[in-house]
Amino acid sequence: PADSEHSAIFQCIQGLPEGALRRIILTASGGAFRDLPVEKLKEVKVADALKHPNWNMGKKITVDSATLFNKGLEVIEAHYLFGAEYDDIEIVIHPQSIIHSMVETQ
């Protein structure tokens, strides 16, 4: 897998017996708006979305990160790549961006 999140999952599940994967946890930095009160979201501009707190990326992926759109795509990817049910895929906000994803096993 090309995404760091999915690559981490792939590495975690190597050697697991069939059926041992209980849950996939994808992490998200939270993007540029993670500390913004919900009522302020109506006022944000594209320039605000481009101020990612952790990463220097291209414009599209930075906006996708700020809106968490990229996490929606990553959930779909994890579902198809690893055969996980959508209810077994979680997103956790992890502002430090140290862990890219985790798995829970039985």
UniProtKB/Swiss-Prot annotation:
PANTHER family: 1-DEOXY-D-XYLULOSE 5-PHOSPHATE REDUCTOISOMERASE, 1-DEOXY-D-XYLULOSE 5-PHOSPHATE REDUCTOISOMERASE, CHLOROPLASTIC. It comes from the Eukaryota. It is found in: Plastid, Chloroplast stroma. Keywords: Chloroplast, Isomerase, Metal-binding, Oxidoreductase, Plastid. Belongs to the DXR family. InterPro entries: DXP_reductoisomerase, DXP_reductoisomerase_C. One of its GO terms (molecular function) is NADPH binding. It catalyses: 2-C-methyl-D-erythritol 4-phosphate + NADP(+) = 1-deoxy-D-xylulose 5-phosphate + NADPH + H(+). 1-deoxy-D-xylulose 5-phosphate binds at S4, E5, S29, H52, S65, N70, K71, E74. GO terms for cellular component: chloroplast stroma. Pfam families: DXP_redisom_C. GO terms for biological process: isopentenyl diphosphate biosynthetic process, methylerythritol 4-phosphate pathway involved in terpenoid biosynthetic process. Enzyme of the plastid non-mevalonate pathway for isoprenoid biosynthesis that catalyzes the NADPH-dependent rearrangement and reduction of 1-deoxy-D-xylulose-5-phosphate (DXP) to 2-C-methyl-D-erythritol 4-phosphate (MEP). Required for chloroplast development. The keyword Mitochondrion does not apply. This is 1-deoxy-D-xylulose 5-phosphate reductoisomerase. Its cofactor is Mn(2+); Mg(2+). Pathway: Isoprenoid biosynthesis; isopentenyl diphosphate biosynthesis via DXP pathway; isopentenyl diphosphate from 1-deoxy-D-xylulose 5-phosphate: step 1/6. Mn(2+) binds at D3, E5, E74. Its EC number is 1.1.1.267.
